[in-house]
A protein has these predicted regions:
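Acidic, aromatic-enriched beta-alpha/helix-loop junctions
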Residues: 38-58, 62
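Helix-adjacent hinge/juxtasegments
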Residues: 56-89
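A general, composition-driven signal for non-globular sequence regions
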Residues: 1-4, 31, 50-57, 71-78, ...
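Low-complexity or membrane-interfacial segments used for flexible interactions
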Residues: 1-44, 67, 85-158
């Protein structure tokens, strides 16, 4: 199971991937500590750190509200979701196209060739993905973070 949880007062997102607990921190570039904290509060770009290498960035996940897309970057590789106004999100990963059908209840399903391969649910401060193939665990963990960033962004504007 993958469980991403926003710790709003600490300004971090913790993502449990199997037995590992990833720490996801917002990106802030200002030199002034107060300006950096304010910048981090409104950031839609997060870096993930794994416990096996706590000082090394595992991935960078960002949400871009203008195009309603989530971008995941691991090293030199980059994947992005494509959004359409009335259709599902799409993602090409490993040369295979996946579609993500979302419901207003926060539940979603990831499909490959019309067959459901992963299911999950997004709340205000959590994103849980229960069933999924093992080979998709890393990208799904980053997508869970992206969904949570998107939810936090839109809740902030409410």
């Amino acid at each position: 199971m993958i469980l991403a949880t926003a710790r709003v007062l600490q300004n971090v997102i913790e993502t449990r991937v199997g037995d590992e607990l990833w720490t996801c921190r917002p990106v802030g570039g200002a030199a002034n500590p107060i300006a950096r904290k304010i910048e981090e509060l409104f950031s839609t770009v997060y870096r993930t750190y794994r416990p096996s290498a706590p000082d090394e960035i595992h991935s960078t996940v960002s949400y871009h509200p203008k195009n309603d897309e989530i971008i995941v970057q691991v090293g030199e590789e980059k994947w992005r979701t494509k959004s359409s106004v009335f259709g599902p999100l799409t993602l090409v990963y490993g040369g295979i196209q996946y579609t993500i059908n979302e419901k207003l209840t926060g539940r979603f399903a990831m499909l490959r060739g019309g067959k459901v391969i992963a299911t999950g649910e997004v709340g205000f401060r959590t994103c849980k993905i229960k069933e999924y193939p093992a080979e998709l665990e890393m990208i799904l963990a980053d997508l869970a973070l992206g969904y949570l960033i998107r939810t936090l962004f839109w809740e902030m504007l409410r």
